[in-house]
Amino acid sequence: MDRPAVVLLSGGLDSTTVLAIAKSQGFTPYALSFAYGQRHAVELDAARRVATALGAAGHVIATIDLTVFGGSALTADIAVPKHDTVEDLQADIPITYVPARNTIFLSYALAYAEVVGAGDIFIGVNALDYSGYPDCRPEYVDAFQAMGRLATRAGVQGTELTIHAPLMQMTKADIVRAGLALGVDYGMTSSCYDPDAAGHPCGHCDSCLLRLNGFAEAGSTDPLPYRGA
């Protein structure tokens, strides 16, 4: 039986792993990505590669303009913080947090799910190596799921929405191991918040450091060509 599911796909390590997990669990994945004015728009090229390579049944890239609000180093003229080690990452919510981004993305996913007849949505949020983002916590996902069941025609008519966050309690190393076990080629992904024009990752933003640390702890080598490496 066909089990359609919407998978939020940025083109990064986490969302790519989630797409592979959804497929391994027997779902027919419909990928959803966003061109939201992010400075690291190279991730959309990665999302296209990933969706094709992992056999998504459909791939929508929705265009929304979050630069009208700004408020983040990813959508405004604000420098992306750089560090030398994972230990240097700040404990509070960083300036790379995009206001309400996951709420906006999940709202679009609700609409896409209704159109393709999906009762399942997958998102790659993580509560352990998550850089302090408030919309990556378990209580947030639970609350949005409850709202989604009330807010859609499908929910009212009896289709029970489930939001899957399979990476929630995994370390970045766990995520890397899981993806490699499923045959994911991480060389086609993009995680950096501040890549150069050729798409090479900086190696020093929060996302790069967490990714590199994850590969190191997993006993593997990140296949991406980092600047200056």
Curated annotation (Swiss-Prot):
Q: Which branch of life, at top level? A: Bacteria
Entry note: cofactor: Binds 1 zinc ion per subunit.
Where along the chain is Zn(2+) bound?
C192, C202, C205, C208
Q: Which UniProt keywords apply?
A: ATP-binding, Ligase, Metal-binding, Nucleotide-binding, Queuosine biosynthesis, Zinc
- Could you tell me which pathway this protein works in? Purine metabolism; 7-cyano-7-deazaguanine biosynthesis
This enzyme catalyses:
7-carboxy-7-deazaguanine + NH4(+) + ATP = 7-cyano-7-deazaguanine + ADP + phosphate + H2O + H(+)
Claim: Transmembrane helix is one of the keywords in the record? no
Q: Which GO terms describe its biological process?
A: queuosine biosynthetic process
Broad enzyme group: ligase
Is Repeat there in the keyword field?
no
Q: What is its EC number?
A: 6.3.4.20
The prosthetic group or cofactor this protein requires is: Zn(2+)
Show the HAMAP family listed in the entry: QueC
What the protein does comes down to: Catalyzes the ATP-dependent conversion of 7-carboxy-7-deazaguanine (CDG) to 7-cyano-7-deazaguanine (preQ(0)).
Family matches, as NCBIfam families = 7-cyano-7-deazaguanine synthase QueC
Q: Which family does it belong to?
A: Belongs to the QueC family.
Protein name (database record): 7-cyano-7-deazaguanine synthase
